[in-house]
Amino acid sequence: MTTQLEQAWELAKQRFAAVGIDVEEALRQLDRLPVSMHCWQGDDVAGFENPEGSLTGGIQSTGNYPGKARNATELRADLEQALRLIPGPKRLNLHAIYLESDTPVARDQIKPEHFKNWVEWAKANRLGLDFNPTCFSHPLSADGFTLSHPDAKIRQFWIDHCKASRRVSAYFGEQLGTPSVMNIWIPDGMKDITVDRLAPRQRLLEALDEVISEKFDPAHHIDAVESKLFGIGAESYTVGSNEFYMGYATSRQTALCLDAGHFHPTEVISDKISAAMLYVPRLLLHVSRPVRWDSDHVVLLDDETQAIASEIVRHNLFDRVHIGLDFFDASINRVAAWVIGTRNMKKALLRALLEPTDQLRQLEASGDYTARLALLEEQKSLPWQAVWEMYCQRHDTPAGSQWLDSVRVYEKEILSKRS
């Protein structure tokens, strides 16, 4: 530990103590908040089922930065490099297309054995795993419908895929001793004016009920459902809208997933957290950065990321909110993208934990909005960076931009050699 860091740390402790904050307790609380990193940043959502296939479902990964992972070994190596540069507890979020098998496996036939290597790797790296059925980039999703498909056989294929995915998710939780959150997102929708908006939603409702009919121990598996405003090719109508899934999660008491990019650009999910928590048992958050649309840019330490973190901390939702990331930028170093986005989420959580929330709440309750605003703004100038640097030091990770040096070395020695 450098003397400079020690001095900054001691000064920070004093400054925060003056506003009633115990920084040691804040760091202990930060270690209760794992962030689930998404595997698909590492290979532009290609997966191992058909790596050369097209990405469909109304989503896009833009850019062609060299060095993307081409197989599971490379993807896990890239993840390990990123994990070394991110302090505190982490999880990994997998999609079904990241299965490993010597022979082709139909999506409705995936089994826990196809993810055994991921489980062993997670154990070695002390990670929990989360999961997602992959209801896109497949011939049977090419016409824009999956769980709401009008063809019963195709619809059943996707139902069976989701049911098989739940068994994989439960396997993760059982093996790793921490529940796997399995999120269902489907791209179903229409490009142009839709006459019958009800029938697809009726089919989706019935399909989801069949999907979740098998019961699993909640200590192993948690169901979540995710809405979206629109996607490319589904601009006019999305079957799984916010209202649909809010109603579904409330009536079935599943978790509800809120993705930062899946709403109108003037909406923010930070404002939805407290409302949804009154009705659903759990929330899954997909923290992302939409630029004009659901572009899935790398997460910044911006106002909305901070607001999301503050909502979690202010309302003590540690045990009811699951924090995941969802972005995929192929225009920059993919390992760096993971590190930047995940560190920013953790920084936002730390800043939220260093807020004198009780004092601010009292000011608000008494109607002293002047002092509330003044203290909120003064809080931004307190030396939270020194606390972050100590947190990094204690977790043996670089405190500042030094982590970029490690990424550059990895890029030169490993990534640059990939064709």
UniProtKB/Swiss-Prot annotation:
It is an enzyme of class 5 (isomerase). SUPFAM superfamilies: Xylose isomerase-like (SSF51658). It is found in: Cytoplasm. Keywords: Cytoplasm, Isomerase, Manganese, Metal-binding, Rhamnose metabolism. InterPro entries: L-rhamnose_isomerase, Rhamnose_isomerase, Xyl_isomerase-like_sf. The keyword Cytoplasm applies. Its cofactor is Mn(2+). It comes from the Bacteria. Its EC number is 5.3.1.14. One of its GO terms (biological process) is L-lyxose metabolic process. It catalyses: L-rhamnopyranose = L-rhamnulose. One of its GO terms (molecular function) is L-rhamnose isomerase activity. Binds 1 Mn(2+) ion per subunit. Pathway: Carbohydrate degradation; L-rhamnose degradation; glycerone phosphate from L-rhamnose: step 1/3. One of its GO terms (cellular component) is cytoplasm. Mn(2+) binds at H262, D294, D296. Belongs to the rhamnose isomerase family. NCBIfam families: PRK01076.1 (NF002203), rhaA (TIGR01748). Catalyzes the interconversion of L-rhamnose and L-rhamnulose. Homotetramer. This is L-rhamnose isomerase. It comes from Salmonella typhimurium (strain LT2 / SGSC1412 / ATCC 700720). The lineage of its organism: Bacteria, Pseudomonadati, Pseudomonadota, Gammaproteobacteria, Enterobacterales.
